[in-house]
Structure formats: C-alpha cells, structure tokens
A protein has these predicted regions:
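Non-catalytic C-terminal interaction segments of nucleic acid-processing enzymes
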Residues: 1-10, 137-150
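Interdomain/boundary linker segments immediately adjacent to catalytic/signaling cores
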Residues: 1-27
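Histidine- and/or cysteine-centered catalytic micro-motif in compact active-site loops
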Residues: 19, 54, 84
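Active-site metal-binding core of divalent-cation-utilizing nuclease and nuclease-like domains
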Residues: 23-75, 119-124, 128-133
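Nucleic-acid nuclease catalytic cores
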Residues: 82-136
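Conserved beta3 VAIK motif of the Hanks protein kinase fold
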Residues: 79
Length: 150
C-alpha cells in the first residue's frame, strides 16, 4: 500500500471529509455543525485536530487576541470554515492573518485553507500551500552563466 507524504495526507483527508459531510448532510447546516463533523471525521482518520484555537499577537509583553482558528490540523494546517456561496477576499485575509500570527509563535504552518460549504450542496476549497520551495536536487544547477571564452 502506498501512503501519501505526511504533508499532503491531512489536506487530502480534509477534502475527502468535506465531500462526505456535504453528501451525507447536504446544505443548510451551521458552520459549527460542519466544523464538528469534520473534526470527528479527522479523529476517526487518526489525524490530530484542535478546534477554536485562540491566536494571539504580542504588543510588547501583552498578548492581544487576533481571533480563533476554526480547526488546526496535525499541527501544520489551519482551516477557516464558512457557510456562504463563495469565498470572498476578506475570508482569505482572515486566514492569512491567522497564519502570520501562528508563524510568529513558531508554528510550522505548511497549509492553510478556507473551506466554504455552499447552499448548492458543494464545497469550495481555497488552499494556500505555505511550504518553502524545495531546493534543487543535489548536483542540479538552476542556471549559471559563464563569460564567453577569450
């Protein structure tokens, strides 16, 4: 049996879980319902998941609440769940604000996504891959320019 890389596996399970939830329960549920169902799906899949994680920024020595992450998955993925017809720029900005705040605390955020459960029984996922670009394989040169011979 082939296993996907550990970085890709949680996101694959998240998307699969959203599909199962929307097929089984359809639209018209609350954000809290979808959040809890996804949390249960991930639990049964063996993936660590925390709900409603407070996110802070520091103002000197004083912590200031930035907001609450809907789901933090596998200590590397941040999810913001919405019940609406489309993902708006403000939803993405909210997600990225949480990502920056968590990265400032030392969390290695590799993925972040806004997941939108729509009225038309579909799920829209806007995923941000936050992993740093991989260096080229050993012995591979990206580009190198040499002066012409004299």
């Amino acid at each position: 049996m082939l296993v996907a890389s550990t970085a890709a596996r949680p996101m694959d399970m998240i998307i699969r879980g959203c599909q199962v939830i929307i097929q089984q329960y359809r639209s018209g549920q609350t954000e809290a319902f979808y959040q809890r169902m996804l949390q249960i799906h991930l639990y049964h899949s063996g993936i660590v998941c925390l709900a409603e994680v407070d996110v802070f920024a520091m103002s000197g020595a004083v912590p200031v609440l930035v907001g609450r992450i809907d789901l933090e998955v596998d200590h590397s993925t941040i999810l913001e769940l919405k019940v609406c017809n489309q993902i708006l720029p403000k939803h993405v900005q909210q997600l990225l604000r949480y990502v920056r705040a968590r990265q400032a605390t030392g969390m290695n955020v590799q993925h972040a996504a806004v997941i939108c459960f729509t009225d038309s029984n579909t799920v829209i996922v806007r995923e941000e891959d936050l992993r740093p670009p991989q260096p080229p394989a050993k012995g591979v040169v990206r580009s190198r320019f040499f002066p012409p011979p004299n």
